[in-house]
A protein has these predicted regions:
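N-terminal post-signal-peptidase region of extra-cytosolic proteins
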Residues: 42-61, 73-75, 92-103, 110-116, ...
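Proline-rich, low-complexity linker regions of envelope-associated factors in Gram-negative bacteria
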Residues: 227-432
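Exported/periplasmic cell-wall-interacting domains
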Residues: 104-262
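Short Gly/aromatic-enriched secondary-structure transition segments
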Residues: 78-79, 83-91
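Bacterial signal peptide processing site
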Residues: 20-23
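Post-signal peptide N-terminal segment of mature Sec-exported envelope proteins
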Residues: 25-52
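Bacterial N-terminal signal peptides that target proteins for export
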Residues: 1-7
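C-terminal motif of bacterial Sec signal peptides marking the signal peptidase cleavage site
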Residues: 15-18
């Protein structure tokens, strides 16, 4: 009897452990779930929430890192700092690294997005779904378009971030509970990769570098504060944690007079020194080398075995880190020229694509930045830096940085009027 009891406990522990990193190999069967919308988070997750000094209904934030195929759930602790509570291996994402530009390009969005209860879709044909909110105000101001870009189940993607059904059941539950607790919007941060010095140096030759440098400012702000940055858009670019004296943000118009809270400036300055040293070291490591970013087909080939015996719609994609490779710059240039010629010969209409493969170029809507320094130089975007660690930043810096008072949300489609009595976020910084 005792042996049976222990066996049951062991099996239960195995299933519960599948809630996070192990779902790639231990895929739970959720066909028995009748009420998926209200299906509760597992006891093991609730125990971890309590252990980390969080409340079940406290706010959450979602982070996505395309290259390694990771989706993270961060949750507010009782001290208003956020800590990672869960991590999932994304089952499928389409396209390559880089932002979504237009309908049909198969690209999954990159940027900062605002999710509300209206973005939850309990009736999705892909089990459950959360709309990413693409296009946001930045995307619209830059002429980018696309519809129905989701985080959903079923492990099949055409511009979405697709999870297993078991994973989306849990992710949906995190969002549902946070909204029940009063959170108005959940910030989604979608990055091409963890924006460390190592990764920025490795991707320094990408045509998307200027866009990524801009995203990195928001990444750095979170790494320092462990709070979702307050995001706005002006002059067709993102700005983060900026205080204004009565000016309003307009995505396509000139930025209002604004400034960064002094405490945040100090913290970011210290952070940047660490980053610069790490970047200099990484540049020496990658001198004369270039990173080849694999195609979707090349990533799918890595996990072809997983599709055997499964329904045709099941279409996992492998890691871009595993499918990509480091090459000598001369070899990389030759490979890009060969691919460009193949594209040109297959369709004259794709000449522009071929050209972009031959010569990486900065985004037309972003200011050019020196290749030697991956951090954006524009002061209005709170240029900052990332520590040398290759994983998520947990270096203790946040403990010394004051927390913004207001709930720092990503932007919505139309910026709401701010209530006069609402406490400005920078006042909290001055308090400590």
């Amino acid at each position: 009897m005792r042996l049976t009891h222990f066996a049951l406990l062991a099996c239960t522990a195995l299933v519960l452990s599948g809630c996070n990193d192990t779902l790639e190999t231990v895929e739970r069967d959720v066909s028995h779930v009748k009420n998926k919308v209200d299906y509760p988070l597992s006891p093991s997750i609730l125990a971890e929430i309590d252990k980390k000094n969080m409340d079940r209904t406290s706010p959450i934030m979602i982070r996505i890192f395309k290259e390694e195929g990771a989706l993270e759930i961060w949750k507010a602790k009782r001290d208003n700092r956020f800590d990672k509570i869960a991590e999932y291996q994304i089952c499928a994402w389409s396209g390559k690294l880089g932002p979504k530009v237009k309908e049909g390009d198969r690209q999954a969005p990159e940027g900062f997005y605002n999710l509300t209860p209206a973005h939850l879709n309990p009736n999705s044909k892909y089990y459950l779904a959360i709309n990413t909110g693409f296009p946001n105000r930045y995307d619209a101001a830059n002429g980018r378009n696309g519809t129905n870009l989701m985080i959903h189940g079923a492990c099949s993607s055409s511009g979405c971030y697709s999870m297993t059904d078991a994973q989306i059941l849990e992710i949906y539950g995190f969002a549902r509970d946070a909204f029940k607790g009063g959170q108005k919007t959940v910030q989604l941060q979608a990055f091409p990769f963890r924006m460390t010095a190592e990764n920025m140096a490795r991707h320094r030759q990408s045509e998307h570098l200027d866009f990524w440098k801009m995203l990195k400012v928001g990444y750095d702000n979170f790494e320092v504060t462990k709070r979702p940055p307050e995001v706005n858009v002006c002059e067709k670019k993102y700005v983060f944690n900026q205080q204004t004296e009565g000016g309003a943000f307009n995505a396509s118009a000139q930025c209002p007079a604004m400034s960064t809270p002094p405490a945040l400036v100090s913290a970011l300055s210290s952070y940047e020194k660490t980053y610069d040293l790490a970047y200099e070291k990484a540049m020496k490591k990658y001198d004369g080398m270039a990173w080849y970013d694999p195609s979707e087909a090349e990533r799918k080939a890595l996990v072809a075995e997983k599709r055997k015996g499964r329904e045709p719609a099941y279409a996992p994609t492998g890691s871009a880190l595993k499918a990509g490779k480091l090459m000598k710059e001369t070899e990389y240039a030759a490979l890009m020229e060969k691919k460009a010629q193949q594209v040109t010969s297959s369709s004259p209409a794709t000449t522009a694509t071929a050209s972009s493969l031959r010569t990486p170029h900065p985004s037309a809507t972003q200011p050019a930045a020196p290749q030697s320094n991956p951090a954006p130089a524009a002061p209005t975007m709170v240029a900052a830096a990332t520590p040398a660690a290759s994983g998520p930043g947990q270096n203790g810096t946040a403990a010394q940085v004051p927390v913004p008072a207001m709930n720092p949300l990503a932007f919505s489609a139309a910026p709401p009027a701010e209530a006069p009595e609402k406490k400005p976020f920078w006042k909290f910084w001055a308090k400590e």
